[in-house]
Design a protein with these regions (language model features):
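Short amphipathic alpha-helix in the helical subdomain of ABC transporter nucleotide-binding domains
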Residues: 51-54
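A short helix-loop-beta-strand connector motif used in the catalytic cores of GNAT acetyltransferases and
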Residues: 61-74
């Protein structure tokens, strides 16, 4: 079971070589409406691209931070300042653990942004939570692109689990395995 406590903390901003992971903001709604209006995008993660649905999804994402101490960030491309997706961490009661999550707008697929953002999020959470033993990713088995990202992040499929009415594959990386592969890499900078 996940305990829900108000951490009172602010949401950090992370920076990688090509991306900034910053707190979600009301001004992101139009960008996320555009992303969620792409049927090829929503085929794998669901949702719909109307402003009310996007706003409510963002409110839930933002609410994850004070309730659990983790949550997703807006992913912004550094050179252009363009909102290109959402990535970070997620958990809720009944969830298999703290989950690394990501999605990138379709015109930016294939650039490694999901892996870069996922790496930053996992580095951050293992750095902030010294007693956390693993991070998971919950992926629909047909979402081959996300499975490949999880595998590039060093995750392995550990089980199937029925969540939100569908069967999902749960991928896991342990703290020990993560730290062993990241020993020579620096954590993302926090601004």
């Amino acid at each position: 079971m996940i305990s829900t406590t108000n951490t009172g903390s602010t949401i950090p901003t992370l920076a990688t070589d090509r991306l900034v992971l910053r707190p979600l903001a009301n001004g992101d709604v139009p960008g996320f409406v555009e992303i969620w209006s792409d049927p090829e995008f929503t085929r794998h993660i669901g949702g719909r691209g109307d402003p009310d649905a996007v706003w409510h999804a963002m409110a839930g994402n933002i609410g994850c931070w004070p309730l659990t101490g983790v949550g997703p960030w807006a992913v912004v491309e550094r050179p252009t300042g363009m909102l290109v997706g959402r990535a970070g961490l997620w958990t809720e009661p009944g969830w298999p653990g703290i989950e690394a999550v990501w999605f990138i707008r379709r015109d930016r697929w294939g650039r490694g942004y999901a892996q870069e953002a996922g790496t930053a999020a996992i580095d951050w959470v293992f750095g902030e939570r010294p007693h956390l033993t693993e991070v998971v990713s919950v992926i629909l088995p047909a979402n081959i692109a996300s499975i490949r990202v999880a595998e590039r992040l060093g995750m392995t499929r550990t089980r199937l689990q029925h969540l939100h009415g569908e069967e999902h594959a749960v991928y896991t990386v342990s703290r020990a395995a993560w730290l062993a592969t990241r020993a020579s890499a620096a954590r993302p900078t926090t601004r």
